[in-house]
Every structure is written in C-alpha cells, then in structure tokens.
Amino acid sequence: MFNYEELFQTHKTPFYLYDFDKIKRAFLSYKEAFKGRKSLICYALKANSNLSILSLLAHLESGADCVSIGEIYRALKAGIKPYRIVFSGVGKSAFEIEQALKLNILFLNVESFMELTTIEKIAQSLGIKARISIRINPNIDAKTHPYISTGLKENKFGVGEKEALEMFLWAKKSAFLEPVSVHFHIGSQLLDLEPIIEASQKVAKIAKSLIALGIDLRFFDVGGGIGVSYENEETIKLYDYAQGILNALQGLDLTIICEPGRSIVAESGELITQVLYEKKAQNKRFVVVDAGMNDFLRPSLYHAKHAIRVITPSKGREISPCDVVGPVCESSDTFLKDANLPELEPGDKIAIEKVGAYGSSMASQYNSRPKLLELALEDHKIRVIRKREALEDLWRLEEEGLKGV
C-alpha cells in the first residue's frame, strides 16, 4: 500500500501523481497484442506529453503520433526516433510541414488536397521526396462523445474515398511525394469494437485497390484508441482489437501502426487535492477543494465522470451525497456531482482517479492559477517530473510589454 502521508510531508496539494509501472504494462500489452506481425505502436502525445512519460515509452521502442511541431520536438527531446514519428492534424502550417520534412520523420498524414499540394511545394523547395499518408474518412459512427468523434462525413477530418483515390494517384505522379500509407481515425474513447473493425475492413479494401493501381503502400495506420472504463463501462479487450485489425488486413503485407494514448496513461494518473471547505446551500452539500477546472478540464468540457477516493482516514464519518467543486469562478468548475462521500474537514486529502490522459495536457492558467506539480511513482520511489509553476511564471512572458509604459 502506497504511503501518501510521507508524500504529503514533502509535497503540497494539488498535484498529479503517475504510476509509471502501470504505463509500462499498458504499453507492453499493445506490443504483445500485435506480436508476430510487423507493427509500430505510436503513442498519441495529445493524451499526456510529459517528457518523462515520453522518455519511458522511448525506452520501450515506442513511436509517436504528433499533431503539432511542438509535439514532434517533445518526442525527439525524449528520445523517440524520427523514423517512428507520424505527423497528423487537419491544420498543419507551412512552417510545421517544413520542419517535419527536414527532421525526416516517418510520414505526414494528409487531410486535404490543398495540404497535399502545400507539402509537395515545400518538398520541392527542399529538394526531397516527402513520405505521405492520406487520412480517409470512412463515414462510420464511432459511438463516442460527439466532441471526440472524428470519422463521420460531417466531421472536419480526412477525405472521402473518391477524393482519397484522386490524391493518391496525384501523389504517385509527383516527383516530390511518396505515398506510403493509408490512415483512418474514427474517434477517441472507443468502447465498441464493431466500428473499428468496420472501418479497418473498409480502408483495407481501399488499400488493396491502391496497391493494384501500383501505389507502393507499406503501412496501415489505425488512429484512435480503445476506451477506458471511467464509470464501470465494459471496454474492448486488446486481443479482440488486434485480431479485428489483423483479420481485416489478411492478404496485405503492411506494417500496422496504431496510435493509443488514453489507454496507455489514463489509469496511471491521480489528481491529489485537499479539502478547503465544506458548505451547505439550500440543503445542497458542497465539498470545495484546492484543484480547479483549469487543472483538470474533462468533467467541465465533456461532463466526464471520474471516481473520487478519500485518502484521509474517515472511518465512522457520516456518508452523504455532495458535489465536489473547485475554486474557479464558474459553476462548471465541478469534478463530480452527487458523490457519496463521508463528512470531510479542511486538510483532508482526496484522489480524483484515472486522470493520466487529457488532464495535465489540457490544463491552463485560467484565473491566473499556476500549473500543477507532477510526480512519478516508479520502483517504489517518487520523483518530480514537472515543477509546480511559481506565481511569477504567470506573467514572465508579459513583463517586456511593461517597458516604456
């Protein structure tokens, strides 16, 4: 059992705490699922891009799915090899494209004809041939939250089958483009295997047609990730996920790329916060804690529910429903409504669970609140992997503007 009391003697709340052994196990389970087939697991940095987490994964020979040049440089800084990095995203700037090509990453996932022509022009100016993949929108409902559904025709992502074919043929004729992969991504937090299999089958059929047309594909890039059980939902078994993709690719000698993020890091993380006050307003019980929606946005943005565990011994205290809320000046600054928790006192510590994904990576300084300390638990030892911001950090980049005022 982990000794939180020792932790509280040296570190003030709120802070993120990650169990690195859980991250290792989650990543290695993906490698095991695709064992025996050419594959590359490209961790999706958007889930959590802390350098120490990336370094841990780099040592396990992870690739990286990046959606900005900043993420690419983070991956490289952490030791992930350029030939294991794919660059996705619907709005890559010319600067980002040029940098990615100079770094000689594995390939760029292209999302429009205009982007394709931009890449070609930049590749021509550099005197190189750009490896590209085209993101196909299979128009399949991922059955997930609408904010993170990406595979329907009304979504901004990817291109339809007809346009994809035109883009591949156009790229094939170019002296500065090398089409090497097909890609699709139907959404995040996937709890139903059927849409993934359907999309894999549909895009695999397209891949076979492209190969028949003389396009030398080498990769089959499956975006999106297996969901996590936040509310005791039934999740997809990793073996079934892998077998579904492998079965769809029968007859295709392509390296499989998958891009998990949430399922690698979510369950490793806790947000540790302490009670500031208890209050009752019109018979409603509120527990006010020192973490806020700026630190962890998912409950406010997605109405996501994360279990809350009381760390401080509370045996014998009366249990009743309450809303656990933060100090930010918005009613949406609520971590969990109607949580059945014991009576709590100022200084009591609680843990918000499964926050390793889309927690710190979506944090902000809203209300001029410094970003949090982040800690790693590895081999029974605690170490700091991100320092807590100081108050001075809130305005450090603005001070130059005061000169001459």
Where are these regions (language model features)?
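Conserved, mostly hydrophobic/aromatic
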Residues: I23, K46, S68, A100, ...
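Active-site beta-loop-alpha junctions enriched in small/polar residues
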Residues: A44-N50, V67-G70, V90-K92, E111-F113, ...
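General structural feature for long, well-ordered alpha-helical segments within catalytic domains
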Residues: N3, D19-K22, A26, Y30, ...
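Active-site loop/helix belt of alpha/beta enzymes
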Residues: N139-Y277, L341, N367, E378
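Charged (often Lys/Glu-rich) extended helix/loop segments that serve as interaction or gating elements
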Residues: F2, F8, G244-L246, D253-V405
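Short acidic, glycine/serine/threonine-rich loops at helix termini
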Residues: L54, K77, I97-K102, I119-I122, ...
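Structured core elements
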Residues: G63, V86, F107-N109, S133-R135, ...
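A charged N-terminal "starter" segment
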Residues: M1-A130, K172-E178, K205, S209-A212, ...
